[in-house]
């Protein structure tokens, strides 16, 4: 029976682990463990990789005595899913409310918003 990918966003730790795998392509538990800062126990990394595999974010192949993990989702797709999840949970599904919140909180100003609008319009005009 195939695995149904979980569309939910990644936790902070899951994202850190996925970033290691996106950067390296294919990794063993030990290789992921070596790249993580601060360091985590081997069993913690192994558990997290297994969770990501069950969620459908990773696949694994047995090579010798070790599993090799690789991503089944691109970084861009994961970012999109995480952003969609954030917008749904925090802004009632409204991307407009996200932008208004950024403006209200001073995290983006009118000038930057105008620049982003120009970039959006340029992209929309391209076939």
Q: Over which residues does each language-model region extend?
A:
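Short helix-coil-helix linker/hinge
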Residues: 10-13, 26, 92
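Short acidic, hydrophobic short linear motifs in intrinsically disordered regions
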Residues: 26-36
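Short, hydrophobic-biased segments on the C-terminal half of alpha helices
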Residues: 49-50
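Glycine-centered, phosphate/nucleic-acid-interacting loop/turn motifs that mediate DNA/RNA or nucleotide
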Residues: 56
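Amphipathic alpha-helical dimerization/coiled-coil segments
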Residues: 79-126
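Short, cationic-aromatic polyanion-contact patches
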Residues: 10-13, 63-82
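Pre-recognition alpha-helix immediately N-terminal to the DNA-recognition helix
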Residues: 15-20, 31
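Short alpha-helical segments that sit at the start of domains
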Residues: 1-16, 126
């Amino acid at each position: 029976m195939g695995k149904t990918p979980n569309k939910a966003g990644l936790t902070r730790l899951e994202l850190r682990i996925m970033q290691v795998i996106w950067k390296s392509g294919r990794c063993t538990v030990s290789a992921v463990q070596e790249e993580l800062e601060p360091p985590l126990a081997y069993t913690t990394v192994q558990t997290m990789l297994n969770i990501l595999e069950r969620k459908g974010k990773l696949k694994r192949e047995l090579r010798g005595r070790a599993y090799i993990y690789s991503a089944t989702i691109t970084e861009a797709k994961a970012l999109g899913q995480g952003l969609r999840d954030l917008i749904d949970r925090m802004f009632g599904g409204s991307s407009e409310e996200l932008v208004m919140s950024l403006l209200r909180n001073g995290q983006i100003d009118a000038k930057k918003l105008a620049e982003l609008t120009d970039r959006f319009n340029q992209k929309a005009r391209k076939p």
